[in-house]
């Protein structure tokens, strides 16, 4: 495994760790998700280029489109939640509360 692959996997692992540890605010969770998607995009692109697998050359672009849609929906939810509750704490989103 090359140094580039290890750095990308380390970036993915750090984003996943950040998502698991700092999940009290919605904004930090969205940033960690974007870091995970970006590292997956780079890893997928490098893997396809190294293996000369031309049939799957559109797969990273499709992943990037889904990441952009996820970011747009996440930011729309963040704005709506911030306007409704006045904060972006995830604990306020529990549907079981009165």
From Swiss-Prot:
Its EC number is 7.1.1.2. The chain crosses the membrane at residues 1-21, 29-49, 59-79. Core subunit of respiratory chain NADH dehydrogenase (Complex I) which is composed of 45 different subunits. One of its GO terms (molecular function) is NADH dehydrogenase (ubiquinone) activity. It is found in: Mitochondrion inner membrane. It is an enzyme of class 7 (translocase). Gene3D superfamilies: 1.10.287.3510. Belongs to the complex I subunit 4L family. One of its GO terms (biological process) is ATP synthesis coupled electron transport. This is NADH-ubiquinone oxidoreductase chain 4L. Keywords: Electron transport, Membrane, Mitochondrion, Mitochondrion inner membrane, NAD, Respiratory chain, Translocase, Transmembrane, Transmembrane helix, Transport, Ubiquinone. It comes from Lipotes vexillifer (Yangtze river dolphin). Core subunit of the mitochondrial membrane respiratory chain NADH dehydrogenase (Complex I) which catalyzes electron transfer from NADH through the respiratory chain, using ubiquinone as an electron acceptor. Part of the enzyme membrane arm which is embedded in the lipid bilayer and involved in proton translocation. GO terms for cellular component: mitochondrial inner membrane; respiratory chain complex I. It catalyses: a ubiquinone + NADH + 5 H(+)(in) = a ubiquinol + NAD(+) + 4 H(+)(out). It is a multi-pass membrane protein. The gene is MT-ND4L.
């Amino acid at each position: 495994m090359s140094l580039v692959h290890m750095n990308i996997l380390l970036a993915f692992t750090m984003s996943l760790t950040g998502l698991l540890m700092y999940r009290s605010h919605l904004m930090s969770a969205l940033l960690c998700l974007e870091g995970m998607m970006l590292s997956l995009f780079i890893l997928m692109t490098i893997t396809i280029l190294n293996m000369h697998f031309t049939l799957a050359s559109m797969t990273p672009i499709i992943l990037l489109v889904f990441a952009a849609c996820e970011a747009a929906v996440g930011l729309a939810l963040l704005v709506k939640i911030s306007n409704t509750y006045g904060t972006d704490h995830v604990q306020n989103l529990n549907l079981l509360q009165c």
